[in-house]
Amino acid sequence: LYCLKKKTLVGGFFMALAVGTKLLPLLLIPFFFRYLGLRNFLKFGLSILGFSVLLWLPFWKGEMLENYTQTIQLWFTTFEFNGSLYNIVRAIGYEVKGYNIIRKLGKVTPFITIGLVLLFSLLNSNRKPQQIFKSMLLLLSCYFFMATTVHPLYLINLIFLGILTGYAFPIVWSLVVFWSYSAYGVG
């Protein structure tokens, strides 16, 4: 929210904390480019980078980057829980290929996500807070629709953005997501 007040240093600090907690906020950074303008966006980006380095420095070891990369790959190519479109693609994969195609699909999904980030940050105006929130909601919705793993807790971001933008579908999604647990029921 500090970015919306164009306080780029403080906004960068809080974004670095968010990224240090979960990588998902990295996807949202480009949405501030048009709103902040080039100069302020560079300040914002450099403050995120600087504060992130300070946050990660105590944990940095030679093999950390490799281990972190492997963890992200594992997330995209191995885990599966409550994935919307993924389940449809997986069923088609079983029908066409005869096996679970998560490893192949997981290698493509990050590129689709990057493409969507560029699409939503460059094609949408994002010059007003309401437009930024709408772009964030659309991107995160697409991301979660494509994801192989979506825990119900992840929908909190969508609910928050849905409230800010007036969209109700995140609330509906959060109400029906618990039906997915029926697939894991006993008997």
Q: Model-derived features: where do they sit?
A:
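Aromatic-enriched
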Residues: 168-187
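Aromatic/glycine/proline-enriched transmembrane-helix motif characteristic
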Residues: 74-149
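Membrane-interface transmembrane helices that cradle and orient dolichyl/undecaprenyl
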Residues: 1-10
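Perimembrane helix-loop-helix junctions
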Residues: 27-50
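Transmembrane-lumen/periplasm boundary regions of multi-pass, lipid-linked membrane glycan transferases
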Residues: 50-75, 157
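Membrane-interfacial loop-to-transmembrane alpha-helix junctions, especially the N-terminal start
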Residues: 44, 128-136, 166-174
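Hydrophobic, membrane-inserted alpha-helices
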Residues: 14, 26-30, 114-118, 136-143, ...
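Transmembrane helices and adjacent periplasmic/lumenal helix-loop junctions
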Residues: 9-34, 54, 145-154, 168
